[in-house]
Amino acid sequence: MWILALSLFQSFANVFSEDLHSSLYFVNASLQEVVFASTTGTLVPCPAAGIPPVTLRWYLATGEEIYDVPGIRHVHPNGTLQIFPFPPSSFSTLIHDNTYYCTAENPSGKIRSQDVHIKAVLREPYTVRVEDQKTMRGNVAVFKCIIPSSVEAYITVVSWEKDTVSLVSGSRFLITSTGALYIKDVQNEDGLYNYRCITRHRYTGETRQSNSARLFVSDPANSAPSILDGFDHRKAMAGQRVELPCKALGHPEPDYRWLKDNMPLELSGRFQKTVTGLLIENIRPSDSGSYVCEVSNRYGTAKVIGRLYVKQPLKATISPRKVKSSVGSQVSLSCSVTGTEDQELSWYRNGEILNPGKNVRITGINHENLIMDHMVKSDGGAYQCFVRKDKLSAQDYVQVVLEDGTPKIISAFSEKVVSPAEPVSLMCNVKGTPLPTITWTLDDDPILKGGSHRISQMITSEGNVVSYLNISSSQVRDGGVYRCTANNSAGVVLYQARINVRGPASIRPMKNITAIAGRDTYIHCRVIGYPYYSIKWYKNSNLLPFNHRQVAFENNGTLKLSDVQKEVDEGEYTCNVLVQPQLSTSQSVHVTVKVPPFIQPFEFPRFSIGQRVFIPCVVVSGDLPITITWQKDGRPIPGSLGVTIDNIDFTSSLRISNLSLMHNGNYTCIARNEAAAVEHQSQLIVRVPPKFVVQPRDQDGIYGKAVILNCSAEGYPVPTIVWKFSKGAGVPQFQPIALNGRIQVLSNGSLLIKHVVEEDSGYYLCKVSNDVGADVSKSMYLTVKIPAMITSYPNTTLATQGQKKEMSCTAHGEKPIIVRWEKEDRIINPEMARYLVSTKEVGEEVISTLQILPTVREDSGFFSCHAINSYGEDRGIIQLTVQEPPDPPEIEIKDVKARTITLRWTMGFDGNSPITGYDIECKNKSDSWDSAQRTKDVSPQLNSATIIDIHPSSTYSIRMYAKNRIGKSEPSNELTITADEAAPDGPPQEVHLEPISSQSIRVTWKAPKKHLQNGIIRGYQIGYREYSTGGNFQFNIISVDTSGDSEVYTLDNLNKFTQYGLVVQACNRAGTGPSSQEIITTTLEDVPSYPPENVQAIATSPESISISWSTLSKEALNGILQGFRVIYWANLMDGELGEIKNITTTQPSLELDGLEKYTNYSIQVLAFTRAGDGVRSEQIFTRTKEDVPGPPAGVKAAAASASMVFVSWLPPLKLNGIIRKYTVFCSHPYPTVISEFEASPDSFSYRIPNLSRNRQYSVWVVAVTSAGRGNSSEIITVEPLAKAPARILTFSGTVTTPWMKDIVLPCKAVGDPSPAVKWMKDSNGTPSLVTIDGRRSIFSNGSFIIRTVKAEDSGYYSCIANNNWGSDEIILNLQVQVPPDQPRLTVSKTTSSSITLSWLPGDNGGSSIRGYILQYSEDNSEQWGSFPISPSERSYRLENLKCGTWYKFTLTAQNGVGPGRISEIIEAKTLGKEPQFSKEQELFASINTTRVRLNLIGWNDGGCPITSFTLEYRPFGTTVWTTAQRTSLSKSYILYDLQEATWYELQMRVCNSAGCAEKQANFATLNYDGSTIPPLIKSVVQNEEGLTTNEGLKMLVTISCILVGVLLLFVLLLVVRRRRREQRLKRLRDAKSLAEMLMSKNTRTSDTLSKQQQTLRMHIDIPRAQLLIEERDTMETIDDRSTVLLTDADFGEAAKQKSLTVTHTVHYQSVSQATGPLVDVSDARPGTNPTTRRNAKAGPTARNRYASQWTLNRPHPTISAHTLTTDWRLPTPRAAGSVDKESDSYSVSPSQDTDRARSSMVSTESASSTYEELARAYEHAKMEEQLRHAKFTITECFISDTSSEQLTAGTNEYTDSLTSSTPSESGICRFTASPPKPQDGGRVMNMAVPKAHRPGDLIHLPPYLRMDFLLNRGGPGTSRDLSLGQACLEPQKSRTLKRPTVLEPIPMEAASSASSTREGQSWQPGAVATLPQREGAELGQAAKMSSSQESLLDSRGHLKGNNPYAKSYTLV
């Protein structure tokens, strides 16, 4: 039974399972029509597909599945339908012109495609033609390609030809979308060509050419519009583009007006009027309607009326898109349709049409709604909505997925064994839709409610049904197989398991079983009780199984009988259960086998209507009784059909006495007995013989028109209609008609002849057959009526003017025929003068003749012969051309050359006769035409000719004649022309070459001989190439303008040290002359371009390295190799670099000896020639080999206890390799025993234990490398002591570390007891305990750690260890390495393309400089470049810079710690300036009537190469300039083709890299006789600005007066400046002696006054200025872009105070003495504040956190207020606790960035002090207490007397460096206070003097320079502040300082003299330096200083008014 249950469950699962991941879809849903050529065949893929793979089938539209027809039709396995090529005789409408569809089917369902109409196009001959057209000149012509209607649908016009030349749509010719050719703006010459169209068959690809048609062009004549092109109706789909043609002929040009549905159409947006008509873009359904094109002019109106049908594509959409439901539910689908209103809609399910039924409802007006109730599993699948309208169709589909509602067992009970009286509960949890019903059985017997079994049921929240079977007290009879069965409308499922109740085994009685023969049967043994031994089955005492069809399952007692057979399997079966070994029980069951009926198959034969039918149904086997019944089409047969059924025993027969069509259908015979019911079905088809529905009758057909011969029939199967034809009216001899595109059989059987021809007349037979009965046929006669046709007429004809002309035409057709003649659409009256018409009949034809007597020119035109009869009319157009002699041609000059003249002519009226030739006459201008040279019979096909062999520059006269067949024309117009120049015939002379560099050659030459120039030499071509014997290098060509008889040119960018060949050619306007003879020269030698390659180095010993390399190629040497240079240096262990050395050799290898052992060396190799060193190779690194190390640098030993000592040592000074270990030796002499101990290579101490007390030991240490043991250290004696004194094993020395790192200072001490350790630091010579804080601490082992070490941590540290028995001390010198200080960068030399920079390095920060990074940027650019520079360099030259351009530079030094701070930005300019034109040169070298030579030698390039030269000129009074542009400047330039006797404006613009210059001039060409013309001043010429020339003259006089005044003022300034220079020279001579005195003082110590240490200093860090006095204590940093802004109140009365804004704070504790700060602002450019010049953008900012900070002392508090730019560093008053506050304010001077300000810039090494001030600054520096340890160096130099502009570094374009100036005086130009060595503890103090640029800046001088001046001035004044305020600069970025509390000044006594004041002034500690209080004192009196003060302040007080900048001296 279990097997049965599982089998049932599996069968249900197979039936109702579904792959929800399967799908169906359409690949190409738009495929609805396939048209192909019969000669090619076609492949049609099925447009449907699916996943998993689908089964594809093709059907006809009738629903019949198609089959393969060999060689004609085949369906491929992939579903592709193939139609093979076929001849026309094999055409079958059923196959080749039919509607198909395909289906795709997989487990998801089945879908069918849209109907696909497949149509074959038969190949048939056809012709296309074009008709002649008429039009008027200037109007439009339209040609149409006429295609036969039978093939019109398949033919496309692809192109048009004009005399075999393809036309392209353009300005005059337009090919429309319909294939018409439009010719716009028709000209007479358009009528000279033939036009034809080219067509292509869309499916066969065949092309056809039409006949040639002519265009007859007439002169414009007033006429009403006549339509040339129009339309009647158009059909289009929405979204397409539609063109509605409408074009008319008329004069004047007609107007067009469009109407839609009788309303004017607005032509905008999508509606556009075009040349061809109306263009509608993106059409819409609303655009459908009637369109009218109205064409009108004043002579009439014409219309084109048509209709536009816009169809919207059909679209069907089913909703919802996804349907997922369950069995038994309702599903509703809706299909919405767009694109049509009257459509046919149908529904399909799985490809089959769906009709309304019991559970199916279709509702809606258009059947758009589908409702399905009580869905069953078979209702799932694909549903489609089909919409059909005419030939269009659309569909949509949706997949309806029905969830499997079949009941499923979720969980159930399991087999178990229970004891009697034990309760049992069985559960079945079932899921299904709808909810299933659960029943229980026990051994196949139903279990009813009540008794011992309790059944309950519930529904869970998940929708599951749970049924429980409970047994409260089980008994043995309750045992057995329990089954729960769940069923609903979707199916049934069961589950069973055995419940065993312990007790005696027995068998429950079993019921007899009925089995069906041929099927499987299961017999279950109903055993109860448990346990038992076995279950066995017997049949007739035979143990089963005994054959293959019997299976006994011993474990559950089930017997299976497969394929039951009545004879064998029927009988009694016994189940035997073995209860105990000797005890068994049994039960029997009887099995009865029933045999089901079997019907012998039968089929209906072929029957025809009216016949009798008898069909028997015989049941050949099966148990009786058997009942037999019949059905038709699945239903009982109604009695009305007259069908008789006879049943006898096991047979039944069906009889029909009179067969009719209503008997068609499927008949089923059904046989039933007790076993089963079976059926057999067969189809009865009643066949009907054919008969006519419509019989053919005699008809008339009109020639050229279509005719339908009616014939239709009916029958079953559908009859076939065949037409046959017999030509003529005789006895019919019928033959099959060959069907083609012209003759076709319609679907109803009628015959269509699309274009009737005369040969179609005759008998036609319509034959109908369908293989049922006899065929039927009927004949008819077709009579062809011929309309009137013109069969013969001349298209064109000619007549000679004044002679008689006849024209005839022949007409054919049904009589009578009327013929009339027309001229230009006007009927000719035979009675008209000069016209005579005659008509006669000749057989079937009518001939009409028109005579013209005589012909005149006006007769030229179009005549038409018009024939008319009852069936039609025809017309023949004849073009008559009246011929006469031609008009003369109009000639013009096409081209003039030196020896040829090319004519071009335009032919006038040709006399209506083709031109037969031309005659050309040519003569010298002075000769008569009788002597002219004649060229006759020039081809008429030509319109140009060339006259050859003329002389250059000669003048000729030329004329022409035209000839045709009638005669010769009059002579043409006469032309006079002068020949052009010819190319020179001679080469340039005296060509010389001179190499001037390694890449340049200077070329000089002279012009060719005069008689060979053939014109004016305008330039030359220089050809040069690398010269090689046997080589064939092409010449490189350079064009050069001429500058005179002697020329010079420099070739640049040549290859170095290379031989070149050079030629020169002269050029004039005509071309280039012959080349000069090739000259050879060689460029100069240069340094090698590349380094040696393959540089290799191998260490051969600890002190030597072997180096080898490859030599350079010849191309890389650039000269003759002189040798190689090897540069090498050691890379030391601490990162420092050793000495750089070099060795020279001539060989490609070298051995380096005497090197350091085990040292890494950097090696570079270069090659050098006679020109110098080449490029170095890349560095390679090689280390020398290891050697034994040196002895340890130091050894210490100390007793740690009575039996132990410690030994420590330092590593060897010379490691010579990698230390592998250290060996410690210990020995004592009595007895001599030496012990060895090994220590690791990173250990520097060792403990030796187990020694004897009070015994001396000797210890020493040896280092070991891989090369062996090194030398021994010194021997130390040590003695173990019980009372061991404190000893430190660490060595004294120097410890170096980078800053910002953690450093540990070791101090390892030993002793007994353990010593105490303390650390001291030396501060100013006084040791003090180190500070222990968060950054400093002492470890337990005595080591001292400093975290994040800083520069101030440097110094001497002492470690002291002591215990009871002694003490020890070491001193460690900690040196903290910091990034290097900024270098001082200067400009040492400038050229036009390079700048040489030099620098002085700053403090290296305790680590050697590793290199420099130079950054540079072009002015006004934000892009910076950089170069790495070797640390040994102190200068660098930047090459290839732009000439006359400003550049910015910064420099950064790098050491082992990292890069230092960036130097100040300096600026320098390469030499050169913009071009200038010399006033000494004349611009115009020569002027004649039409040419001017300009002298360009006057242009000075300013030192920079000219990059462009632009010249423009124009006649006065015109606005258009003639422009000439060059990239280089020649010596001269010639203006050609000028107007005679005309004034011209000329302007030139010449540019180089430094700038551009312009020059304007006026000139006048000469009269034809060489005389000059009147000047411009005599006429009033209106210029562009509207000023007359007289007004311009007034303006010129005004400007001249102003210039004269400025010039006089300039002369006055020069005189004043000269006097001041003389006074300055005198002061310099006076200062020389003072300099000598100061230099002698340099060797002795200056007496200084005792001063208290300054505690208050204010720091102001301003870029581009440096303070040369440093103080590192008590300082703060203020923004590096700041400016000090001092208000008047700051230096006013003490009671006045002001507030300010604070952003940076500096605190001061007390007031310091004002000894006067010294400020150097010399590196700032006067007038150009670097911080406010936004275009001077530098790289990283120059601020630094670790470098020394510059400081300023407080000045006197009572000085007046001023605002200063950042060009200054100012002393600022401060009080205790005062605060700096910063605010930003900007004020930009208009002249700050002018080039004048640039030219007066001073370099970063300049200062504006006088020589006296410099000397006094030096003397004052020696008095400073902080500089007492400094070493002073004084540099004596010469100071130039030139202006500050000439002393500016890098700004003078005429000097290369500062030293180029002429020296005039010597003296001190720099002194330096050098810092002492670090162990001396000194500070660096540099010194300089302030620079005051303006008279009012006297207040900024330090007290020792200004006290004598101020103290020697008396008298009150009120204008002091005002005067100083006027002398100040405009503020830039400023800082406002708060007014501090004014301290009471200490009075000072005036010195007796200025010198005593300056040299002897002393200051009291803690006092404030002040000036004497002078109420109302006027500072303006400062201008009245004495000569001594003037000497002190030199130019400061004298530059007021003229030059605001002071004299500057350069500090080197």
Swiss-Prot record:
Residues 1718-1810, 1855-1883, 1971-2012 are annotated as: Disordered. The keyword Membrane applies. It comes from the Eukaryota. Residues 885-982, 987-1086, 1091-1187, 1191-1285, 1379-1473, 1474-1575 form the Fibronectin type-III domain. GO terms for molecular function: cell-cell adhesion mediator activity; netrin receptor binding; protein tyrosine kinase binding. Residues 1855-1865 have a biased composition (Polar residues). Residues 1-17 form the signal peptide. CDD domains: FN3, Ig, Ig_DSCAM, IgI_5_Dscam. Residues 1799-1809 have a biased composition (Low complexity). Keywords: Cell adhesion, Cell membrane, Cell projection, Disulfide bond, Glycoprotein, Immunoglobulin domain, Membrane, Neurogenesis, Phosphoprotein, Repeat, Secreted, Signal, Synapse, Transmembrane, Transmembrane helix. GO terms for cellular component: axon; dendrite; extracellular region; growth cone; membrane; neuronal cell body; plasma membrane; synapse. SMART domains: FN3, IG, IGc2, IGv. The chain crosses the membrane at residues 1596-1616. Phosphorylated at tyrosine residues. Phosphorylation is enhanced by NTN1. Disulfide bonds join C46-C102, C145-C197, C246-C293, C335-C385, C428-C484, C525-C575, C617-C669, C711-C766, C809-C865, C1307-C1359. Residues 1617-2012 are annotated as: Required for netrin-mediated axon repulsion of neuronal growth cones. It holds the Pfam family fn3. Glycans are attached at residues 28, 78, 470, 487, 512, 556, 658, 666, 710, 748, 795, 924, 1142, 1160, 1250, 1271, 1341, 1488. Ig-like C2-type domains 7 to 9 are sufficient for interaction with NTN1 and commissural axon outgrowth. The transmembrane domain is necessary for interaction with DCC. Cell adhesion molecule that plays a role in neuronal self-avoidance. Promotes repulsion between specific neuronal processes of either the same cell or the same subtype of cells. Mediates within retinal amacrine and ganglion cell subtypes both isoneuronal self-avoidance for creating an orderly dendritic arborization and heteroneuronal self-avoidance to maintain the mosaic spacing between amacrine and ganglion cell bodies. Receptor for netrin required for axon guidance independently of and in collaboration with the receptor DCC. This is Cell adhesion molecule DSCAM. It comes from Homo sapiens. The gene is DSCAM.
